């Protein structure tokens, strides 16, 4: 028997996740100086982490030889205070929110189940679901990237186990109205997962709905507004009944001692968080006004740019040659061939982006 035959049948047809390009990759491929490259393809915080988080990492460095608490209780308590949600409804996850997605998929999805995904959106939902035997049902968003709730509800069947929603959506930046989420959740027994990775940049959040509906889950991350992408840490807000079941299959010690220390400190640093949000708001306005292509409105820390009649792949390549890393959205299902996602950077970075796009 060939060794690859040991791999589950479900894995063979799954497309590998496409990450944003790294600075090291661009330096190697284009012969650029690392200091000249700006990374605006992965929606990281251009201000970096909270100084308090860095201090906490240093202060706790000697403790990394000891296992952290199995359920990340200290971090969960800090998240509870930050969100005003009871700790009994919160799980910390690693690596990142992806760990939460993997855990939920292992918990509820089996062969023959279906999951509904509104595209274009974050591609890891599909990977986590299909790896556990699910069939993916796509519901394509409207031209303005809003969700047609009636069309989504029509896609549900008795086999639907999970519905994945992203708000603000990646890569489009728009939010799903609370009333639409409620309409979906009350019309099904399936779990409704709402990805709020970018919620700190949005006007509202829907975490409170978890306390009112027993099939809504909210996923969040420390990778964006909190500037801790390298720590790979997220969390889930879910009904108590689901948390009790989730903890049965959660990977033990899945949030490291270092990550917990940094996360707790970052949650306490409202000054750094507010600076990050303020920088994003100002940068968004500048890019929307100055970029010479159509820019969609956003409640995230990135803008979506339609470079038609050019191809996103061609424009992205030209920008890479100039040391500007952005995200070609061609790999997102149903995103088309002309969309580019640009992380909102510092004033200087944004000005460089506008100049580069203007030269296209």
UniProtKB/Swiss-Prot annotation:
**Cofactors that this protein relies on:** pyridoxal 5'-phosphate
List the source organism.
Answer: Methanococcoides burtonii (strain DSM 6242 / NBRC 107633 / OCM 468 / ACE-M)
Name of encoding gene: hisC
For the modification N6-(pyridoxal phosphate)lysine, which residues carry it?
Answer: 224
- NCBIfam families in the record: hisC
Could you say which EC number(s) this protein's record lists? 2.6.1.9
GO term, biological process aspect, one: L-histidine biosynthetic process
Q: Which reaction does it catalyse?
A: L-histidinol phosphate + 2-oxoglutarate = 3-(imidazol-4-yl)-2-oxopropyl phosphate + L-glutamate
Any one GO MF term held by the record is:
histidinol-phosphate transaminase activity
Q: Which family does it belong to?
A: Belongs to the class-II pyridoxal-phosphate-dependent aminotransferase family. Histidinol-phosphate aminotransferase subfamily.
- Pathway recorded for this protein: Amino-acid biosynthesis; L-histidine biosynthesis; L-histidine from 5-phospho-alpha-D-ribose 1-diphosphate: step 7/9
Put simply, this protein is called Histidinol-phosphate aminotransferase
